[in-house]
UniProtKB/Swiss-Prot annotation:
One of its GO terms (biological process) is iron-sulfur cluster assembly. Its cofactor is [4Fe-4S] cluster. This is Fe/S biogenesis protein NfuA. Keywords: 4Fe-4S, Iron, Iron-sulfur, Metal-binding. It comes from Pseudomonas fluorescens (strain SBW25). The keyword Transcription does not apply.
Length: 194
């Protein structure tokens, strides 16, 4: 079950918007684009009957159904959708404190734990050089496939950073991980730090 909260004020505002769509059974779909990254954006969209996905979690509310995207669900933990009135009318707000970095524990999937450590421990250090690293995949043999960007792409020290910094940190924190692999095209050097 998802831990997203839709306040009464937000519910009433959304119910009013949905009633104006003249589509019986229309609801909303809540999702995050690029979850677990610094570029994460929380979104709410209309969801006509049949547009929901089988893996979505259906949250039955008083006047409509909110469909929570399965892939985004962990990142929507503790999220609050609210509506506040002001002199200009009002504003719908979505606060999702885990959109960029979800809460993780030892039972969380490996990819979520990798993203957590990339965002909280590794990327803040790389940001001082204008760089970042992102998880592309975890292959079956326990290898994290990573890609550098920004000042790290093409940097002469990227392999040292990968082995002595990133790999060491991830292996210490995630015992079932066996190693890391870089798939960055380091021939592109125009933004490289070194």
């Amino acid at each position: 079950m998802t831990a997203i909260t839709i306040t009464d004020a937000a519910h009433d505002y959304l119910a009013d918007l949905l009633s104006k769509q003249n589509t019986p059974g229309i609801g909303i779909r809540v999702f995050i684009t690029q979850p677990g990254t610094q570029y994460a954006e929380t979104c709410i969209a209309y969801c006509k009957p049949g547009e929901e996905k089988p893996e979505d979690t259906a949250l039955g509310l008083k006047s409509f159904t909110a469909y929570i995207d399965a892939f985004s669900e962990a990142f929507l933990d503790d999220a609050v959708v609210d509506y506040a009135t002001d002199r200009m009318g009002g504003q719908l707000t979505i606060k999702a404190p885990n959109a960029k970095v979800p809460n993780v524990n030892a039972d969380s999937p490996v990819n979520e734990r990798i993203n957590y450590y990339l965002q909280t421990e590794i990327n803040p250090g790389l940001a001082s050089h204008g760089g970042q690293v992102s998880l592309i995949d975890v292959v079956d043999d326990g290898i994290a496939v990573l890609k550098f960007g920004g000042g790290c792409q093409g940097c002469g020290q990227a392999d040292v950073t990968l082995r002595e910094g990133i790999e060491r940190t991830l292996l210490e924190r995630i015992p079932e991980l066996k190693g890391v692999r870089d798939v960055t095209d380091h021939t592109q050097k125009e933004n490289a730090y070194y």
